[in-house]
Each structure stands twice: as C-alpha cells, then as structure tokens.
Amino acid sequence: XYNLLTIEDIDVKGKRVLVR
C-alpha cells in the first residue's frame, strides 16, 4: 500500500523505500 496517513514499506523498482 500506499497510504499518506501511515508509514508504509513499499517496493519501488526493486528498492525498499519508506514512505511517510
């Protein structure tokens, strides 16, 4: 997922990124 209200671990082009 992707949720702007939560910190979620998403896979972008094979890289693990932290989205806040």
Curated annotation (Swiss-Prot):
Single biological process term from Gene Ontology: glycolytic process
Annotated EC: 2.7.2.3
Pathway where it operates: Carbohydrate degradation; glycolysis; pyruvate from D-glyceraldehyde 3-phosphate: step 2/5
Major place of residence: cytoplasm
Keywords of the record: ATP-binding, Cytoplasm, Glycolysis, Kinase, Nucleotide-binding, Transferase
GO cellular component: cytoplasm
Residues in the signal sequence: none
Presence of the UniProt keyword ATP-binding in the record: yes
Misc remark: On the 2D-gel the determined pI of this protein is: 5.6, its MW is: 56.2 kDa.
Quaternary structure and partners: Monomer.
Protein name: Putative phosphoglycerate kinase
Originating organism: Clostridium pasteurianum
Gene name of the record: pgk
